Amino acid sequence: MGLFGFGKKEKDKMKDGLEKTRTGFWGNILNTLTGSKIDDDLYDELEEQLILADVGGEVAIKLVDKLRDRVNEKGLKTGEQAADELRELIADEMRPEAEMQLDGHPAVILVIGVNGVGKTTSIAKLADYYTRQGRRVMLAAGDTFRAAASEQLEIWADRAGVPLVKAGEGADPAAVIFDTVKSATARGYDMVIADTAGRLHNKANLMGELAKISRSVKKAAPDASLETLLVLDAITGQNAISQAKEFCKAASATGIILTKLDGTAKGGCVVAVKQRLSLPVRFIGVGEGIDDLIPFTPEGFVEELIPRTGWKH
């Protein structure tokens, strides 16, 4: 493992996946700062560019206010110096308060999110990632309300080379996940990744269903650890944040998977997610391949998004 906690392959994937974002609106932010004198007009323009990059108005104002304070405290004079400070500030704002808890027996990851955001493929990509990390992974087809969900997940499980536990349409999701955790424990698997229903038409039902699943996990394996990752589509930008806020009213997520980051020239919602939802981004999707889901690190993200190379101080 190399820089920022991941290897060259992951670093290259992040670099390639952020190409549109780096050369798009974030490129405009750098152009705004580079060669500029630090004054109120610059701060106003930077705030506007951050909003255009999908950071959102509230977060953009907060970032610029903090940048202004840091610039004044350190006596910085040039836009290039301010850009370096912005890099550090963004990394600080996105840093998680704790690592994922995956030391249970088994470690269980529930994956939640509305249909169409890349939830099923993210599950398979998680399975592939953790398998490559040496974990023995089993999948649970917990979305029993959508006819094609289990079949789709089965195809991806085959690609990832991991076993899948499923039941018929309309089966109790908590029972499916209970059986999976029991099976994993009996067969020596140390991780279960579970799909859940991708709908949000009734918050009370969803909340009750996820609470029941959580109880079933602990009943099946008292020593299990439990993480709940919410999948969001980066292309939808601020709409993803609004959608996530609604989902989080019904579900206690512990982290975010941000998919399709390679498909947007904005990408500012990565920053907004942590600020608006108080949830860390754990993984980002930077392509369609099964190995194109990579662990997110603020330092790695900022390094590729706002490179220092070639700047004069």
Which residue ranges define each predicted feature?
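Surface-exposed, interaction-prone regions with an acidic/low-complexity signature
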Residues: 4, 17, 251
